[in-house]
């Protein structure tokens, strides 16, 4: 791949992974508009790893505190806000793992197309708008509870459908369940860690077994750009989301979905 192509695709991955606007909808645009071939399995692994490293490093203190508290809850039975949050994150991960294994082949075969992505981009954008407008509660992440965590986990499982947006679906569910905008975003970002780690392990195994030639320079550039873009995205999103709300992302999703439908008809 050309350097411009590497940087653009890595930027798209890094910026859209944590914004509620669907990364799959954006990754399909370069191929549609510029006629680019698929970037290859190894490049997907690299840019996803970059995004995962960004969220892990950004929330390193939270994750370390949660991990220690979780271990203490197992060893000594000590419960704290951090240990409960860790358990809720684990619980919220289960539906995506089950649904992902069960429906992976069906989704890849039948739902990974522009029509589905355009439709879900618009539909789930409208759901995000409704949830943001109707939500009046200000619960923190430590007030989530296991029932809400499980429901948010089902939303994450639904986001396996291309165009839905994992962050968009989980934030929508969290807002509907009474979490504040900032809490909904933080819970969504923390949820991405176990899912991302699991996916990274699986795809790395597939990559090792793949006969695909590996361009390590391209992978390094892609991972770095994706990491920087994702880190900046998380920082500014959490900084401004309480005041800004979800409306700008909803409008953007409606425009993006319309553009994708226009490309279908073109």
From Swiss-Prot:
Assigned GO CC terms: plasma membrane
Reactions catalysed, as given in the entry: di-trans,octa-cis-undecaprenyl diphosphate + H2O = di-trans,octa-cis-undecaprenyl phosphate + phosphate + H(+)
Entry's transmembrane regions: 1-21, 39-59, 87-107, 111-131, 149-169, 183-203, 218-238, 246-266
UniProt-recorded Gene Ontology molecular function terms: undecaprenyl-diphosphatase activity
Short name of any one Pfam family annotated for the protein: BacA
Stated family: Belongs to the UppP family.
HAMAP family per record: Undec_diphosphatase (MF_01006)
Protein's name according to its UniProt entry: Undecaprenyl-diphosphatase
Lineage: Bacteria, Pseudomonadati, Pseudomonadota, Gammaproteobacteria, Alteromonadales
């Amino acid at each position: 791949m050309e350097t411009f192509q590497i940087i653009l695709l890595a930027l798209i991955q890094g910026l859209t992974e944590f914004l509620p606007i669907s990364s799959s909808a954006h990754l399909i645009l370069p191929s549609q508009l510029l006629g680019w071939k698929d970037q290859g399995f190894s490049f997907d692994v690299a840019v996803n790893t970059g995004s995962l490293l960004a969220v892990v490093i950004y929330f390193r203190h939270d994750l370390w505190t949660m991990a220690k508290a979780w271990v203490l809850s197992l060893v000594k039975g000590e419960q704290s806000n951090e240990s409960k949050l860790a358990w809720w994150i684990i619980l919220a991960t289960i539906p995506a793992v089950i649904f992902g294994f069960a429906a992976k082949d069906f989704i890849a075969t039948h739902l990974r197309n522009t029509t589905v992505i355009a439709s879900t981009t618009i539909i789930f954008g409208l759901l995000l708008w409704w949830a943001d407008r109707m939500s009046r509660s200000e619960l923190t992440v430590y007030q989530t509870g296991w029932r809400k965590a499980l429901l948010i986990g089902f939303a994450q499982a639904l986001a396996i459908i291309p165009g839905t947006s994992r962050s968009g679906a989980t934030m929508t569910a969290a807002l509907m369940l009474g979490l504040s905008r900032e809490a909904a975003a933080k819970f969504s970002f923390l949820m991405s860690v176990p899912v991302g780690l699991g996916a990274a392990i699986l795809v790395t195994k597939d990559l090792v077994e793949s006969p695909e030639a590996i361009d390590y320079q391209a992978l390094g550039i892609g991972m770095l750009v994706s990491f920087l873009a994702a880190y900046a995205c998380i920082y500014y999103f959490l900084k401004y989301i309480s005041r800004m709300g979800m409306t700008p992302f909803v409008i953007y999703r409606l425009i993006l979905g319309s553009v994708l439908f226009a490309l279908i008809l073109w």
